[in-house]
A protein has these predicted regions:
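Short, well-ordered alpha-helical packing segments
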Residues: 26, 30-33, 37-40, 56, ...
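C-terminal, non-catalytic "cap/extension" segments appended to globular domains
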Residues: 1-20, 27, 31, 213-214, ...
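Intrinsically disordered or highly flexible coil/loop and linker segments, enriched in small
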Residues: 34, 38, 42-49, 65-82, ...
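Short pre-active-site segment immediately N-terminal to the catalytic Zn-binding motif
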Residues: 449-468
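Short His/Asp/Glu-rich catalytic/ion-coordination signatures at enzyme active sites or charged loops
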Residues: 9-24, 73-92, 115-157, 217-257, ...
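Active-site-proximal, well-structured secondary-structure segments within enzyme catalytic domains
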Residues: 128, 132-133, 161-164, 171, ...
């Protein structure tokens, strides 16, 4: 029997990763796609009059095997990719796209849905069932089910091409980034780099037979410390240009023409469905609602932050000039001199803080924070199979002892693992046909600095913040109480989904929480008062620059997705990018072919197309939401319970704005965010 499709015999229905055979995914997808199609065909062919149960609910519950296969496959594809997995993903992409089009473009299926929708007032549905019906009807009515046959066929082809191109973009990024190596054998050139970074680089050099020296890569734990601490501007330039040329090297992994095709196809899809631009189509179902609202927020924040950012840039540049640097500072010089400035004026070196943030203690502290706020508890299980030896598994239970779900953690970079950090649902939360509450299985994936032979994994405060962020997403999934999987957990509009994650980041800035766990991994000494004071003084360091950087990404995303005419062949993506984000840029432009767009996975392969602004949108929400904790106590269980009840448990049961105001009692404004970043209006 197929190793992927076998029903789980493990506790909680966990995946038997140790039994999976990669080659079995081909057949597993074939079987799962066929099963889903048969289930949908049965709904369409039903001789019974359409009802909520035989149409909407039946459609919601269809495809269980496909959900099972996809949940494991796409996690492995991102966290443990092999050439065979990537090949399989390319092979199954057209079949998945065809299945999606078969469903969403089916006129008889849409007709059944429409009849149920029009009868909704007489059906006596509860609020969640009505929400499912609403989402189902909206989704089909906006997906082209009523288009003429010729336009439907074109829409099928567009969706198929988009699926394949998005997949190729991500795989090009992974392969291009992972092939780069920078070997350094001059000790003076790496003087000042963190010992942990050097130890990993030394081990990699030995592993790859480079001899005495250090081997650096573009993975975050290697790249960012290198850019902050390498004293050689020449080597920093080499590293930076390599990073910014990912997907733009003019070879098999070049993404430039692929970007043009992607955005043109997205435009065509939107216009087939009646919108002027892809952004217009996407934003009608977001909190923002329109491109006008998105640009309004971006412009309002830019007006508030850019003057501060320009002052920050001038201060760092003056400091660098006095230290002998050549002005203007180039992009590859910025991180290095900003770090020197922080050390000089705030007496704060993030590497000095690493020993106080040993990963296992940080993990325990974050779990304990969730216990303190929400009453939930984490118990490690060592008897469940995992897909890599780095992965740990935890059972999560509520305060009353009831089971909430499984949490997998995967912390370290390795070959075949994408860069960055993310949370995935391996299995969604939902109620089965028998009424059983199927609890979620969630994975947190990071790329933290690895342990070495003589040191455990030690984190910077920035890495702790990343952990908190992704853990916030996991809480959103873990605490869901929905009956319908498509509404549960993180299945909310994109500009709301970052609220729970970004809210969790706030506790890193709270002394009371830091004091509960931050001790030196060797001596047990508590994080010294002087270091906490320095962290607090530096809290707003480069707040303006960081905000403008994020805003520039938002402008770039919107520029790609507000086009109303196709982009011509031969498009210079570098020039397009430079124009799109110019007003939010502070440093000199990088030389061609270097650019952000060709590796901008969030918008070209990660689901954030016309949605990157959502990080700033949610930042406004999270600052305003955390103000409630500050008003009532940062460990207030009453406030936490209200957030759990009104936001974390709700999924997409109600509109995001309604959920937020149910928690906060008012609309959010940017005032709390500006105060948090030290800006008074």
């Amino acid at each position: 029997m197929n190793s992927i499709c076998q029903p789980s015999q493990l506790p909680h229905g966990a995946y038997a990763f140790d039994q999976f055979k990669t080659e079995d995914f081909r057949e597993a997808f074939r079987l799962a796609i066929e099963e889903k199609r048969r289930e949908v065909e049965a709904i369409i062919a039903s001789p019974e009059a359409p009802t909520f149960a035989n149409t909407i609910l039946a459609l919601e519950r269809s495809g269980a095997l496909l959900e099972w296969v996809s949940g494991s496959f796409y996690n492995l594809l991102h966290a443990e990719a092999t050439d065979e997995l990537m090949q399989i993903s390319q092979e199954v992409s057209p079949s998945l796209s065809a299945l999606s089009s078969f469903i969403t473009l089916s006129e008889p299926l849409f007709e059944r849905i429409r009849q149920v929708w029009e009868a909704r007032e007489s059906l006596q549905l509860d609020a969640e069932d009505l929400r499912l019906l609403e989402r189902c009807y909206e989704g089909f009515s906006e997906s082209g089910a009523q288009l003429p046959a010729e336009e439907k066929e074109r829409l099928r082809e567009v969706k198929r091409e988009l699926s394949e191109l998005s997949l190729t973009f991500g795989q090009n990024n992974l392969k291009d980034q992972q092939r780069f190596r920078l070997f350094v054998d001059d000790a003076a050139a790496v003087e000042g780099l963190p010992l942990s970074t050097l130890a990993v680089a030394r081990e990699l050099a030995e592993k790859e037979g480079k001899g005495e020296g250090w081997l650096f890569t573009l993975s975050a734990p290697s790249y960012f410390p290198f850019m902050q601490h390498c004293p050689s501007s020449t080597l920093r330039q080499e590293m930076y240009l390599a990073k910014m040329a990912v997907g733009a090297a003019g070879d098999a992994y070049d993404n430039r023409e692929l970007i043009r095709r992607l955005v043109n196809l997205r435009l065509e899809l939107a216009q087939l469905l009646g919108s002027k631009s892809f952004a217009e189509k996407v934003l009608t179902r977001r909190m923002a609602g329109s491109t006008t609202a998105v640009y309004g927020l971006l412009d309002e924040l830019l007006e508030a932050y850019k003057p501060l950012a320009e002052k920050e840039l001038a201060a760092v540049a003056d400091f660098a000039r006095e230290a002998g640097a050549t002005l203007p500072l180039q992009p590859w010089d910025w991180s290095y001199w900003a770090e020197r400035y922080k050390q000089a004026f705030y007496e704060l070196d993030e590497e000095e803080l690493r020993p106080y943030f040993e990963l296992s203690r940080v993990s325990d502290a974050i779990f304990s924070l969730a216990t303190r706020l929400y009453g939930i508890r984490f118990t490690e299980c060592t008897d469940l199979p995992v897909y890599h030896s780095d992965v740990h598994t935890y059972e999560v239970h509520d305060a009353d002892g009831s089971y909430l779900g499984l949490l997998y953690t995967d912390f370290f970079p390795r070959e075949g693992k994408q860069s960055g950090a993310w949370m995935n649902n391996l299995q969604e939360q939902y109620h089965t046909a028998e009424g059983e509450d199927h609890r979620p299985h969630i994975v947190l994936v990071m790329n933290f600095t690895q342990p070495t032979a003589d040191r455990p994994a030690l984190l910077t405060p920035g890495e702790v913040r990343t952990f908190l962020h992704e853990f916030g997403h996991s809480l959103h999934g873990m605490l869901s109480t929905c009956r319908h999987g498509s509404l549960s957990g993180t299945n909310v509009v994109r500009d709301f989904v970052e609220l729970p994650s970004q809210l969790m980041e706030n506790w890193l800035d709270e002394r009371e929480w830091l004091q509960s766990f931050a001790v030196h991994y060797q001596t047990g000494e508590a994080l010294p008062e002087v270091l906490m004071e320095r962290m607090e003084r530096a809290r707003h360091f480069l707040a303006g620059y960081a905000a403008c950087r994020q805003l520039s990404f938002g402008y770039l995303d919107m520029a790609w997705h507000t086009i109303t005419e196709p982009l011509a062949e031969g498009l210079d993506t570098k020039t397009f990018e430079d124009t799109a984000w110019q007003k939010a840029q502070l440093l000199p432009a990088t030389p061609a072919p270097c650019q952000m767009s060709t590796s901008f996975g969030h918008i070209f392969s990660g689901g954030y197309a016309a949605g990157y602004y959502g990080y700033k949108w949610a930042e406004v929400l999270d600052a305003d939401a955390f103000a409630a904790f500050q008003e009532e106590g940062i460990f207030s269980t009453a406030t936490a319970e209200r957030f759990r009840r009104e936001v974390l448990s709700q999924g997409d049961r109600r509109d995001a704005e309604e959920l937020y105001q149910s928690f906060r009692g008012k609309k959010a404004t940017i005032d709390a965010l500006l105060r948090r970043d030290g800006i008074e209006r």
